[in-house]
Structures are given as C-alpha cells and as structure tokens.
Amino acid sequence: MKPENKLPVLDLISAEMKTVVNTLQPDLPSWPATGTIAEQRQYYTLERRFWNAGAPEMATRAYMVPTKYGQVETRLFCPQPDSPATLFYLHGGGFILGNLDTHDRIMRLLASYSQCTVIGINYTLSPEARFPQAIEEIVAACCYFHQQAEDYQINMSRIGFAGDSAGAMLALASALWLRDKQIDCGKIAGVLLWYGLYGLRDSVTRRLLGGVWDGLTQQDLQMYEEAYLSNDADRESPYYCLFNNDLTREVPPCFIAGAEFDPLLDDSRLLYQTLAAHQQPCEFKLYPGTLHAFLHYSRMMKTADEALRDGAQFFTAQL
C-alpha cells in the first residue's frame, strides 16, 4: 500500500502509548539500521534495560538444557515454593532479536500475577537457527523439565505456554507440536498469546498499519520470515502457518491478546474466530490505543500491566 494511504497511527494511539513513544533514553545510541544483526541485537538488549527495571524480586535460577542442537539457556522464576503449574515463556523479537534479559520484567510479572513457576527458554535465534529448530528446542526443554521435575522442585503436572509476537507463534506451535506428536510433558492447561503472528500472508491490518515506529512494514515482515524459514515450502507448514494445522480439536485454552494499532491484529482475530467457530476454548481481548510490543512498557503503561494480569488470570482459571 502507498504509505500515504496508511492510518496516521501515531496520532491515534492512546496518551500513555504516546508517552512511551516519546520517552528518550539519552545514553542510548541511535538504532543501527544498516548494522549487522549482532549490532541490532546488542542495541535491542541495551534499549530494553530501562523498561525491565523495577520488576518484582523472586527466587530465580538458571539452567542449561540439552537438546539435539546443543545446550539451550533457561531461566526459572519461582514466586512461591508450591507452584500450581509451570508456564514456559517464549520471547518475541521477530525470531532474530531478544533474549531472557530483554523480557525479564514480563516474565517476572507473569510469575508474580499467576503465582506459577515461569521458565523462559532462550531458543536459538535466526538466521543461525532455521525452522523448526526453535520449536524443537522448546519441546526438548519442556520434556527435560518434565523428566527432571522432582530434581528441580517444579510442578510439571500442569503446564502452559506463553509468548509475545514471534514468541506467541512459537508458544502455540509448540503446544500443537506436543499434541500432534503425542508427547507427554504434563497437561497443557492454557496458552497465552500476546499480539502474535499465526500465518496470514496479507490482511487489512497489515495493509493499513505498520511503519518505522514498530518495525512491522511489509518489508520488515518479509525479512523476519526469510531469516526464520529454511525454504519456501515452510511457509505452508502447519507449525508456521498455524491455520494449516487442525484447530478443530484438542487445542488448549487460548488467551489471545490484540493491540489495536498492530499490523498483526488480524492474525489474532482470525485465530480467535477459527477456534471459537469450532468450540475450542478461547478468549480474545483487544487493548485500545496500543502498538505492537506494548507489553514491554508496564513501567509506564497501565494497559500493559492489565494485559499481563489478564493473561495470568486466564491461565490460573484453567487450573
């Protein structure tokens, strides 16, 4: 779409979202738009430090988990000794950015609000890792903790997956992978999905929205996809285009959160409408005035905190 035809998003977002957009970090260098992926990853980690400050303190442990691809870092957040369930968190970042530090506050708040153990999985980023490596690493970590639950003193009888953006796709894809391959890692009580992409190649919101403010232009989305997938055929895989999977049966209860001015919003709407049409347990909530990635900004945005509380409440209601 011709850029002039897109919605004037920055004029339409909420007051608290505008405050976030206008928040300057004077010690931060400019975004290395023409830099290497390594430079962009470093910048992303630095930029997120401010937004991760002030998170709840709790017992935190780090473990390296073996997979067929090598060791994968995990981080456990334990808000109480006797957790009712374990939530696996997959960070966003377009498959190419992000780590356990960039999403630390999100995971801590989710653990605090749910009172469940949260395990962040630092899956290998793309393009170093190609589809389906990240999913297989997540599944391997889930199996590992299920087998070692007593040693790590965690409750793996009931589990869940949660993620934002690309992490939301990985969360649902991992749950479907376990279902389809009949892998027992405990009962999947729920899946929490914040503004994910699930397989649409075009949509109204992808046309009307997306720009330099969110890194989600059509060109950006194509770049993330090309970095993540191994070949063109992967675009139709039921673990990438999740609408090609069977969404009519045995889908764990899904909390689907949408951001009003997110180009990926139609992915969330379609996922909800598909699941609801086939009587699969699901809930959709739209957060007005928000941009993609708003979950990071709970230091300033009540809406971000609300979205995390909503997800935690949905999950605990399934237990």
Curated annotation (Swiss-Prot):
It comes from the Bacteria. Keywords: Cytoplasm, Hydrolase, Serine esterase. The keyword Hydrolase applies. A motif (Involved in the stabilization of the negatively charged intermediate by the formation of the oxyanion hole) lies at residues 91-93. InterPro entries: AB_hydrolase_3 (IPR013094), AB_hydrolase_fold (IPR029058), Acetyl_esterase (IPR023508), GDXG_lipolytic_enzyme (IPR050300), Lipase_GDXG_HIS_AS (IPR002168), Lipase_GDXG_put_SER_AS (IPR033140). It holds the Pfam family Abhydrolase_3. GO terms for molecular function: carboxylic ester hydrolase activity. The active site is at S165, D262, H292. It is an enzyme of class 3 (hydrolase). Belongs to the 'GDXG' lipolytic enzyme family. Displays esterase activity towards short chain fatty esters (acyl chain length of up to 8 carbons). Able to hydrolyze triacetylglycerol (triacetin) and tributyrylglycerol (tributyrin), but not trioleylglycerol (triolein) or cholesterol oleate. Negatively regulates MalT activity by antagonizing maltotriose binding. Inhibits MelA galactosidase activity. PANTHER family: AB HYDROLASE SUPERFAMILY PROTEIN C4A8.06C, ALPHA_BETA HYDROLASE FOLD-3 DOMAIN-CONTAINING PROTEIN-RELATED. HAMAP family: Acetyl_esterase. NCBIfam families: PRK10162.1. Homodimer. Interacts with MalT and MelA. This is Acetyl esterase. The gene is aes.
